[in-house]
């Protein structure tokens, strides 16, 4: 089983929308994976001022094969009185064999509904490689994000809530080559805008969160918020005070900083 890493690097995202975008991206990708019958263990969503990211753990190599029943003409139309295939029945069989199969009338089955009985064939559809499916899944999820007003940047015709600057897409330690939001995928991310502004390589999808910490970014929204709460409480306790932190304001502050450091004014 592998870990898929996706990171969308942008200009600063609107702080009042960041948590909503994080949750919507996670939910959309989860739904799309289920729709494609792709199993996984967990999706961990990250959101910081200049990035949205996901790690998807426990992902296999291929979709499972599936059975698709092909319905043909009615039994009455498919066979003549002698039990031989009519032109309608032959046409159905030829259509099944058009992709290289060598089926005969003995391979055909029958299905019935309230309108009658029909010839049919249970077609096995081989599962696709999951890394081939991920780029389209992720692009669809981005297209479906609840963004009231999208924008273009320069000559790029792809729209998003803010200009996109880089895309990371990996399966374990291998880049999944694709184009998302008009940008080629890679393994290059960026840290804190001032403390670690240069690109750095992600060597493995499982190392994402720790690598960002090494480059002065707490990528996990909830962890940043917990750090802010703990720091502010400590500062308040030092002067026997009580910190007043409305949740809406706390969410906004969490969305504004990569590496929170609380200060107490005199």
Swiss-Prot record:
EC number: 6.1.1.14
GO molecular function list: ATP binding; glycine-tRNA ligase activity
Keywords of the record: Aminoacyl-tRNA synthetase, ATP-binding, Cytoplasm, Ligase, Nucleotide-binding, Protein biosynthesis
CC annotations in GO: cytosol
Superkingdom as given in the UniProt entry: Bacteria
Reaction equation(s) it catalyzes: tRNA(Gly) + glycine + ATP = glycyl-tRNA(Gly) + AMP + diphosphate
InterPro entries: Gly-tRNA-synth_bsu, Gly-tRNA-synth_heterodimer
Top-level enzyme category: ligase
Record's subcellular location: Cytoplasm
Gene Ontology process terms (BP): glycyl-tRNA aminoacylation
Family: Belongs to the class-II aminoacyl-tRNA synthetase family.
Binding partners and assembly: Tetramer of two alpha and two beta subunits.
Protein name, per record: Glycine--tRNA ligase beta subunit
Species this protein is from: Moraxella catarrhalis (Branhamella catarrhalis)
